[in-house]
Regions:
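Active-site helix of classical SDR
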Residues: 113, 150, 158
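Alpha-helical segment proximal to the catalytic Tyr-Lys
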Residues: 118, 159-167
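C-terminal substrate-recognition "lid" of short-chain dehydrogenase/reductases
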Residues: 204-229
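Active-site loop-to-helix junction immediately N-terminal to the catalytic Tyr of the SDR YXXXK motif
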Residues: 93, 139-148, 160
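Residue(s) in the substrate-gating loop at a strand-loop-helix junction
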Residues: 133
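Short, small/polar-rich loop/turn modules that mediate ligand/substrate recognition or access, typified
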Residues: 125, 166-170, 222-224
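Substrate-binding pocket helix/loop in short-chain dehydrogenase/reductase
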Residues: 88-90, 94-99, 193
């Protein structure tokens, strides 16, 4: 069995970066994709020889098709890239705003997964983790219904993938709650709403990364599941 090689989208910062760091500490190789070149290069440099980085926009099917997945063939995938969108009632959203959310949060993971399946190394048991959200289960906070809808679609996609790709691949989703990352800045909740979280605080990217590591490398009989990392909040 070869060393695991994990493709991570949205890997330049936040949860994606924390997952990459955790996996490198386990001895895995990581393929880092993001649209932010400077941050991506910095993350790659910090992770060292077990990391390769490439600027890839998962909303662009041609960019995905052109990405290098042959130098290091991936065995595992983390569909982490996503956007929150602007706080606005779904009644006021333009079609273009809704389509952009769905393009990045739903279509992107589907396209990346298809490319991963065509490229993946077959000599190592593999797994996929999709980064959803508790918003996909509860509909999202006021003003973020479109985000919640996109993450709900990703949860449905996770279950379909788990069914269709078994027994060769395990597929699970993570559903974080309020996590201290740049994307969550200005999002509903945060430290000011800590009283709404049973554990009394927001989570960290590292705590989500720990759950991702477990699903990827240490959960051989777990598939088709949604693991909440939300401090008890639903």
């Amino acid at each position: 069995m070869s060393r695991p090689t994990v493709l991570i989208t949205g890997a330049a910062a936040g949860i994606g970066r924390a997952i990459a760091n955790r996996l490198v500490q386990r001895g895995a190789r990581v393929l880092l994709w993001d649209v932010s070149a400077p941050a991506l290069e910095q993350t790659r440099d910090e992770l060292g020889d077990l990391a390769r980085a490439e600027v890839v926009d998962i909303a662009d099917e041609n960019a995905i098709a052109s990405a290098d997945m042959t130098t290091w063939r991936p065995t595992h995938l983390v569909n982490n890239a996503g956007i929150l969108g602007q706080k606005r009632s779904w009644l006021d959203l333009e079609a273009a705003e809704i389509e952009r959310l769905l393009r990045i949060n739903v279509t992107g993971p589907m396209l990346v997964t298809k490319a991963f399946l065509n490229a993946r190394a077959l000599d190592t048991p593999g797994a996929i983790v999709n980064m959803a959200s508790i918003a996909g289960e509860n509909g999202g906070a006021p003003g973020f219904a479109a985000y919640g809808a996109s993450k709900g679609a990703l949860l449905a996609l996770t279950r379909a993938m788990a069914r269709d790709l078994a027994p060769d691949l395990r597929v699970n989703a993570l559903a974080p709650g309020i996590i201290q990352t740049a994307m969550q800045t200005g999002a509903p909740g945060g430290a000011a709403n800590a009283e709404a979280i049973p554990l009394g605080r927001a989570g960290s990217a590292e705590e989500v990364a720990g759950a991702a590591e477990w699903l990827l490398l240490d959960a051989p009989y777990t598939s088709g599941e949604v693991l909440r990392v939300a401090g008890g909040r639903r």
